[in-house]
């Protein structure tokens, strides 16, 4: 089904920071912020790899889990991130999800987000909001799961109205060192659906039968996204091949430019999808230089189609389900370590608008295939797994 063998840039993978009481439990994959802090250590070995990632608020809700039973008239929400709200990717996507949630939740007030939060400062940043009795503290990524265990445990006793929402985190594997998950929930998007949506667009838009993907780091979510991306594209045309790199980091646009330029030259890539924030901006520069009429980009995780992005034909959009978390805080049902799933059924995963470079015929086919992706019938788990095992 793959049509080609794959090789990838080999990079180091660092384990999550675990608490002292359970360091021996397991080692898990490096998180997004650690990749940013460590920089692009493998950048000099620019290896190319060929082959072929809201509800409405209640008008009469309880005062969350404080147990008072009285109606709360206002709520505060705060966001902590490793990057900035204008990164064009990960943190901007979270920030826009929060703004959308606020539009339908008039009782809520957003405090100033904490940007560029270093690993050493993550717990302190959260504690600052705990001390203000902020109702919902959002951590943009699984790195915060490894940093907040002690803060959460203390807050559960001393600030029972404070709740924590950590995105891109599986509580069953990434929060085993927590003393309590009572005030915690996480969000997990359907990465298979995201990748498949990008894959059908790539499969329908490519003329050279060669598509590319850049990931910031080799996370399980990144591997699932790429595997579904290639599987869906090959469902359109089994001869399509994929080029990938999972070690690009999230900050160096020039690396994205260089990778994409080489893939265009050596592998004739004409469609790209990325999961690497600023690096994706560099990839788009290379596509534009090669010709925006023939080289296309699928953006992620926000909708950026417009005149200032001539290569972007559509976007895979992730909503981080913050509105649902707000509803649960208001009703008193938030917590217990539940994982909120974002998918095509609840608006957590979607495609953005199309550029005028996408024909009506292609748009109609994308719509048809999207319904199959939503129903789980377009690609199988086995097809995705077969590709993922080869990476």
Model-derived regions: residue spans:
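Bacterial lipoprotein signal-peptidase II cleavage site
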Residues: 51-64
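N-terminal secretory signal peptides
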Residues: 1-51
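A residue-level marker of the well-folded mature domains of exported/periplasmic proteins
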Residues: 67-391
């Amino acid at each position: 089904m793959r049509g080609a063998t794959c090789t990838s840039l080999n990079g180091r993978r660092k384990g999550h920071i675990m608490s002292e009481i359970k360091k021996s439990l397991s080692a898990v994959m490096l998180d997004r912020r650690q990749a940013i802090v460590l920089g692009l250590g493998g950048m000099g070995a620019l290896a190319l790899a060929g082959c072929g990632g809201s509800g409405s608020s209640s008008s009469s809700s309880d005062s969350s889990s404080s147990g008072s039973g009285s109606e709360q008239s206002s709520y505060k929400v705060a966001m902590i991130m490793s990057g900035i709200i204008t990164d064009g990717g990960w943190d901007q996507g979270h920030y826009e999800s929060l703004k959308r949630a606020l539009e339908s939740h008039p009782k809520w007030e957003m405090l100033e987000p904490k940007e560029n939060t270093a690993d050493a400062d993550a717990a302190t940043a959260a504690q600052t909001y705990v001390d203000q009795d902020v109702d919902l503290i959002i951590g943009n990524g699984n790195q915060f799961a490894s940093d907040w265990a002690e803060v959460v445990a203390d807050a559960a006793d001393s600030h029972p109205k404070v709740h924590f929402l950590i995105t891109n985190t599986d509580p069953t594997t990434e929060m085993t060192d927590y003393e309590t998950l009572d005030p915690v929930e996480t969000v997990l998007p359907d990465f298979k659906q995201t990748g498949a949506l990008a894959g059908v667009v790539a499969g329908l838009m490519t003329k050279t039968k060669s598509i590319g993907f850049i990931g910031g780091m080799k996370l399980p979510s990144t591997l699932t996204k790429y595997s579904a991306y290639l599987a869906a594209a090959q469902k359109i045309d089994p001869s399509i091949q994929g080029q990938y790199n999972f070690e690009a980091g999230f900050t160096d646009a020039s690396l994205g430019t260089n990778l994409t330029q080489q893939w265009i030259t050596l592998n004739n890539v004409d469609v790209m999808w990325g999961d690497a924030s600023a690096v994706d901006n560099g990839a788009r520069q290379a596509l534009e230089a090669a010709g925006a009429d023939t080289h296309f980009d699928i953006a992620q995780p926000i909708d950026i189609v417009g005149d200032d992005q001539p290569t972007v034909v559509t976007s895979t959009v992730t909503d981080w389900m913050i509105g649902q978390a707000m509803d649960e805080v208001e009703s008193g049902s938030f917590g217990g370590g539940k994982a909120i799933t974002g998918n095509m059924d609840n608006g957590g995963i979607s495609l953005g608008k199309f550029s005028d470079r996408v024909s009506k015929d292609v748009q109609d086919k994308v719509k048809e295939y999207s319904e199959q992706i939503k129903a789980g019938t377009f690609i199988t788990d086995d097809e995705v797994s077969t590709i993922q095992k080869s990476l």
